[in-house]
């Protein structure tokens, strides 16, 4: 306590001195989030320590001046010496090789909810990159709403993903004008590669995404991918939109966007299968159901599930579009995504008499090449533990008709659409490598930013898997 008192006396003597931060970036020690360091920050830090303030991996970053992941008297000492003219330890900053998205929440409030949006200002600095259109400025920012998103990454990772809703439609980094986007924080290799495979095989819609560096409330947050939010829209999942609470039996047959995923959600129902397993179903559009809508979608998925488990082509083909299923399946086999038929499994349906569900779009390749015993390549449904046991897939692959459609799409896809994938991957890695290094400085020890080793390892795994798949599907049978 005596040391703390001495430091406070020293700080009072320096009360007229301040240090400015870079435009858009807070300097280390900016406890009060006013983009400068002065006596007020020292006072706030002292008060915080006396009241037992705890370190937070993101929001304490400018306050943890010596980067020891603690808020303590050492930080006060460094601040005071900085006001005397000594240099502070540098904070990680953006690489300057990608556009920078600045987001400042209202009142600089923390983003700590996946349910409640908070208001924020934003602007996009093109960083002089050719072909990139800047949006907004620090003096005239644009508006948005922002909240958390994700499951494992939100709950377990210090670096958080976000969902954003712009005040007005914008074309972000060349993507179609829209208000709804996600900021994906991880998987710099597997998500872009999985999405590119989806585009190449010809699924009707694949979310567009672009890399960007993010500064949140003046703190460098790292490398993110701005990604289109999956939603019903003429430029996204292009089905006729169904109104919330619709009761007309003709109108409730289509406009559906649903997801098979076990993470708990308020818009979710469960189907008990004959073997005692539970099939979890989320409904995204419409997202507020009348009794008629709930009865319709529940019965449709129940009938689909029952038909698949009976392993009768003539029955389950009534409910499943074979072409989209085959393309979706091939993409996930190529990247060996062991979670692909367990979570983030999107389905959609057009309006009309047809009862067929279409597979896609793809989303979340976080478990790509997640199998540890990979020395002998195998199919997704083989050698899988109970945690990743896929819904439906083991039954579907028993169908000769389905295998025939898979082989047809494989021969269209390989080798012509696959042969330049490694060039695409190398170009992607080259584009984001310096930003990935900056991200690694910001979030040391995290797996997703080790791009060089990831790239060679994943390409090796993909070559082996493609060779295996072509041996199974490439010849006429």
Residue ranges and their predicted role:
Residues 163-165, 170-171, 185-188, 202-207, ...:
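Internal "kinase-insert"/substrate-recognition segments embedded within catalytic cores
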């Amino acid at each position: 306590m005596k040391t703390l008192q001495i430091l406070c006396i020293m700080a009072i003597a320096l009360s007229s001195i301040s240090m400015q931060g870079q435009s858009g970036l807070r300097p280390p020690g900016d406890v009060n989030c006013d983009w400068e360091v002065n006596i007020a920050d020292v006072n706030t830090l002292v008060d915080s320590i006396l009241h037992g303030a705890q370190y937070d991996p993101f929001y304490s970053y400018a306050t943890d001046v010596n980067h020891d992941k603690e808020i303590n008297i050492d930080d006060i000492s460094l601040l005071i010496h900085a006001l005397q003219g000594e240099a502070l330890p540098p904070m990680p900053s953006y690489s300057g090789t990608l556009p920078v998205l600045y987001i400042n929440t209202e009142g600089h409030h923390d983003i700590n909810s996946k349910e409640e949006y908070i208001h924020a200002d934003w602007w996009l600095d093109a960083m002089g990159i050719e072909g990139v259109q800047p949006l907004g400025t620090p003096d005239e920012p644009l508006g948005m709403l922002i909240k958390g998103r994700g499951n494992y990454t939100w709950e377990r990772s210090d670096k958080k993903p976000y969902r954003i809703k712009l005040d007005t439609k914008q074309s972000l980094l060349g993507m179609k004008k829209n208000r709804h986007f996600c900021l994906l924080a991880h998987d710099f290799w597997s998500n872009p590669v999985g999405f590119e495979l989806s585009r190449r095989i010809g699924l009707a819609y694949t979310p567009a995404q672009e890399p960007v560096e993010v500064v949140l409330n003046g703190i460098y947050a790292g490398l993110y991918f701005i990604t289109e939010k999956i939603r019903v829209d003429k430029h996204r999942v292009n089905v006729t939109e169904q109104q919330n609470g619709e009761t007309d039996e003709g109108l409730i047959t289509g406009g559906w966007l649903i997801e098979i995923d076990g993470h708990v959600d308020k818009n979710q129902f469960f189907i008990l299968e004959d073997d005692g397993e539970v099939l979890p179903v989320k409904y995204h559009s419409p997202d507020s159901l009348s009794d008629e809508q709930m009865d319709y979608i529940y019965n449709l998925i129940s009938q689909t599930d029952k038909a698949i488990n009976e392993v009768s082509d003539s029955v389950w083909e009534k409910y499943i579009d074979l072409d989209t299923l085959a393309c979706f399946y091939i993409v996930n086999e190529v990247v060996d995504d062991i979670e692909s038929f367990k979570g983030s499994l999107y389905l959609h349906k057009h309006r009309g008499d047809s009862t067929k569900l279409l597979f896609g779009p793809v989303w979340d390749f976080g478990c790509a090449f997640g199998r540890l015993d990979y020395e002998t390549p195998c199919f997704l449904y083989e050698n899988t533990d109970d945690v990743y046991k896929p819904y439906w897939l083991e039954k579907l692959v028993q169908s000769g008709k389905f295998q025939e459609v898979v082989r047809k799409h494989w021969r269209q896809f390989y080798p012509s659409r696959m042969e330049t994938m490694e060039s695409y991957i190398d170009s992607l890695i080259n584009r984001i490598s310096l930003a990935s290094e900056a991200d690694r400085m910001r979030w040391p020890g995290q797996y997703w930013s080790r791009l060089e080793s990831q790239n060679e390892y994943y390409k090796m795994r993909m070559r082996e898997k493609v060779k295996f798949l072509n041996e199974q599907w490439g010849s006429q049978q």
